[in-house]
Amino acid sequence: MLQIDHLTMHSLQSGRLFLDDFSYTLRPHERTVIIGEEGNGKSALLKYIYDPTLVEGYMECKGRRIVSREILGYLPQSIDEEEKKVPVYAWFCQQDGFYDMNPSSLGAMAAEMGLEADFWYQDRSFGTLSGGEQIKAMLAALRIKKPTIYLLDEPSNNLDLDVLAWLEKEIVQLPGAVLFVSHDVHLIDACATGVIHMEQLHRKNHPRITVADVDYETYREQRFAAMENQREKAVSDQKKEKLRQQKLQRQYSSVDYALNHISRQDPHGAKLLKKKMKSIKSTEKRYAREKEDMATLPEEEESIVIELSGAPIAPGRKVLELKNYCLKTSDGTLLCPSLNFAVYGPKKIAIIGSNGAGKSTLLRQMLDLLRQAGFQTGYMPQNYAEVLSPEMTPIDFLAPHGDRDSVTVARSWLGSLRYTSEEMTHEVRELSGGQQGKLLLLKMALEKDEVLVLDEPTRNFSPLSQPVLDAAIRNFPGAVISVSHDRQYLGTVPDVIYRLDENGLVEYSGFIGEDR
């Protein structure tokens, strides 16, 4: 059993409180998801549970973590660059329990996970594996370790649709308990039996954490119903309070006027009026006490606000056309010998395909062609470090010239995406993945782009922010070319979905999400 006792967690740099006296018990075989807005401390909590030393450089934590007789397995959101250089076989040799596995057991596991039989012994570097292969390798390493509790941080990032379907089944079937962070609504719906919801209220000055032993859909419904009931009761109570205060004020004014104008020759009448005034003041005090118990409007975490206004593109205008295009990687590896594709007008295009098919490579080459053609083009890469320097601040990125007007506009936009004043001056390296993604969105909003090229745009956005992001991209007046495996995004945003493989781009007509 995993137990957290009275945990308080706050940032060493900003002093912001992320958890306040949080207690929680993860029982055997539970599948609990941690959700919340970007930068609310979800990954930090998961790291603390696995090993408190992982966060001691930037978080101060007080409380108890009890993991008696439990074996913890941790899947990080990403692995560091040095680890990516290690050959696959050497990487597995570093994992607990690998030397105890016999070839037949490894072969059976490879078949079960959809991997090549000799996957474990390959000499290519770990970083050359596709996103799906990396996740499978890390999950395999966890299974070899045989933990009793699995801690998974955004396990669905960078996975294609086929691997996502596999991952959902894998999480459900894992032995032991699972505590995971995810933004993928479909994954959460399929796997979670409980919810931990981390929120930051009052402009991120007050943390609130909600634990619910129900699936995510039920949690959303119960949360919405409870807030609506509280809102209705609060409005009703406020209306009743206003009416009775008005009545009390009329009574007070009437008696006060009578007291000021009563004749001295009527002492009995004055005595009755004073008695009535005393009763009114007593009622006023009673009302004040009762008001403390009245329902208040429900407190909700402020949602993000984003609009990608952009520059409109006329329907029918050719944006990009590829004819018999040969798709190769930067080192000359052939991915597709002949590719045909065209985008016209303000179309919203999404590209899907297996990990390693070349989607990100194609997207970068499309970006170059669009800019060569003179289109003002915004770009969100899968790896934010391609465009974000780790030393710069959000203000530096959005207002590089540093003039007062540009800085004022940048601060206003950052505030609309729930950045605090302190976060606006933090270095990019200190921001969460979601906060970095928001920076790229703001850059596109400020530059009035004609075309957006987006590689996994929703990958670091919470289930609560994603509908806002989806709507912003859908309502963008220009063209959008995106790569995504997010089923909610694919079901709501693109006009057309293409699948990329070695034969080219083919329009995809399969069922994805809830709206297709």
What is each residue range found by the language model?
Residues 1-229, 314-516:
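ABC ATP-binding cassette signature C-motif
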